[in-house]
């Protein structure tokens, strides 16, 4: 698949969610590697943090989650003017539904134990084959043991809800020890999936204002959004 570059980060030039899902499922043979959502904040961290830069460069599949990234691609690459934002939470749900139909085993990592179990139960109602779970509260010394559990489970898809950059670091290590699976970083997706966190209404999502909805409902996130201002400056000065 073709790629585009935004701020030095290479992303899949995929037009919409349906196309990306079909690409990852590869006619029933799930691709292996790391799947990471890219937004403006992550691109700015890529510019500032050498470790994050390395993690993102080594991730096989990166897609445009943030509307600002989508706007940059449309402006920078006229041939991709129809590219759409692919929300990570929506992509994950679609993949879960498809994996359930294909009977491919799934392992869930991250979040609190109660949210994790609620997620697993709901997925099982969707006929998803959940072969293991691990909450996000574990020490670095336990990582190898957890990864061996994942490997022993035979999981082909591992979703990791630990927030960035913890989930990227974990996926990197897990892939080194167990490369025969697709790893996806999903942040707070489990909380949204089971109804613990309210997601922006569809009209906000369609307008590309989901980030603003999050700030209004979680004011502690405002500092993270300062990077959006920096991104906007880079965009206006054509440094992306």
Where are these regions (language model features)?
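N-terminal nucleotide/polyanion-binding subdomain common to many enzyme families
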Residues: 1-86
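Short glycine-rich anion-binding loops that position phosphate/pyrophosphate groups of nucleotides
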Residues: 40-43, 162-167, 189
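Conserved acidic residues
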Residues: 60, 106, 131, 156, ...
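A transmembrane-helix-recognition feature enriched in membrane-embedded lipid enzymes
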Residues: 70-71, 199-240
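Conserved beta-alpha
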Residues: 70-149, 153
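Short Gly/Thr/Asp-enriched flexible loops that form oxyanion-binding sites at enzyme active sites
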Residues: 120, 168-177
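Short, flexible loop segments at boundaries between secondary-structure elements
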Residues: 135-141, 179-217
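Proline-aspartate-enriched helix->loop->beta-strand connector
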Residues: 150, 154-159, 164
